[in-house]
From Swiss-Prot:
<comment type="subunit">
    <text>Homotetramer.</text>
</comment>
<keyword id="KW-0520">NAD</keyword>
<dbReference type="InterPro" id="IPR000683">
    <property type="entry name" value="Gfo/Idh/MocA-like_OxRdtase_N"/>
</dbReference>
<comment type="function">
    <text>Involved in the oxidation of myo-inositol (MI) to 2-keto-myo-inositol (2KMI or 2-inosose).</text>
</comment>
<comment type="similarity">
    <text>Belongs to the Gfo/Idh/MocA family.</text>
</comment>
<dbReference type="InterPro" id="IPR050424">
    <property type="entry name" value="Gfo-Idh-MocA_inositol_DH"/>
</dbReference>
<dbReference type="GO" id="GO:0050112">
    <property type="term" value="F:inositol 2-dehydrogenase (NAD+) activity"/>
</dbReference>
<protein>
    <recommendedName>
        <fullName>Inositol 2-dehydrogenase 3</fullName>
        <ecNumber>1.1.1.18</ecNumber>
    </recommendedName>
</protein>
<dbReference type="GO" id="GO:0000166">
    <property type="term" value="F:nucleotide binding"/>
</dbReference>
<dbReference type="Pfam" id="PF01408">
    <property type="entry name" value="GFO_IDH_MocA"/>
</dbReference>
<keyword id="KW-0560">Oxidoreductase</keyword>
<dbReference type="GO" id="GO:0019310">
    <property type="term" value="P:inositol catabolic process"/>
</dbReference>
<dbReference type="InterPro" id="IPR004104">
    <property type="entry name" value="Gfo/Idh/MocA-like_OxRdtase_C"/>
</dbReference>
<dbReference type="InterPro" id="IPR023794">
    <property type="entry name" value="MI/DCI_dehydrogenase"/>
</dbReference>
<dbReference type="Pfam" id="PF02894">
    <property type="entry name" value="GFO_IDH_MocA_C"/>
</dbReference>
<dbReference type="InterPro" id="IPR036291">
    <property type="entry name" value="NAD(P)-bd_dom_sf"/>
</dbReference>
Amino acid sequence: MTVRVGVIGTGMIGQDHIRRLTRVVTGAEIVAVTDIDADRAASVAGGVGARTMPSGADVIGSADVDAVLVTSWGPTHAEHVLAAIEAGKAVFCEKPLATEVEDCLRIVEAESARGKRLVQVGFMRRYDAGYREMKELVDAGGIGTPLMAHCVHRNPTVPETYHSAMAAQDTAVHEIDTLRWLLDDEIVSAQVIRPRRTSKRFEHLQDPQIMLFETESGARIDVEVFVNCQYGYDIQCEVVGESGTVRLPDPARTGLPSAGSVRAAITQDWKQRFADAFDAELQSWVDSVAHGAAGGPSAWDGYAATAICGATVEALHSGQVVPVALKDRPGLYGGNNQ
């Protein structure tokens, strides 16, 4: 079966996903595209032999669209995902599932009412080979009961439009989802520490930040977010257990011998660092649509991430430990291991 995909949003990530679906992933075809920038949509559609449509509603309602890819502006996600659920169509939604917790819950409730999973959220790190190796070891009991996790998320620079809350909402959201999945544990509180600010930042920005989380089991997670580190895109993760530790392996790098030493280039952005994970993520989605059973990060995971990010932003502003109070998980959604 070839999955016929309609795409809502042809910005940078939308174009990246369209390229993957047409050049890397097997079993998919782009048939319809829409964007608020009609000229851009037409240009992208022409490159893959798809047609343009006036709106997301038109894409979702099209009889020849089997599944929907939502890569539009974050505040529009809920509208499109809810429409896809109502139409009974599988939908891949880039993070965030929705920018507001209430909208995430509407999506969870709508999907639960249908009694079938249709939504997959774009948390690509679950498909990264290094993280998957860590997950296998943790699940197998290789380090004993997890006690702590240490994470680092560094970017070389960010644009002036990046503000302090985005350290949680756009950056650490990946660590938040990954650690929920990696530990199969729920985060119950958030705290943010403000270290000395780097001089390599815009005046309005608190950078770096250290985020502290506690899980239901009592495990502790610390996440360093430093988005103006200058030297490269650096992702680190270590889980400490009762009988051992497991660390995210560094990506393969080509060594450059020079002046008595060997230098290795450092990845400069997320697109390069997680290229293989993005490929695997979309292949998994297409395969699941073809087999009629959604997998991967769920609407519940999207809701939890948005709620935890909200608590983290509150903690940043208040300086307090902020509890995370999630609703009861509907029966449609299992644990964090999907």
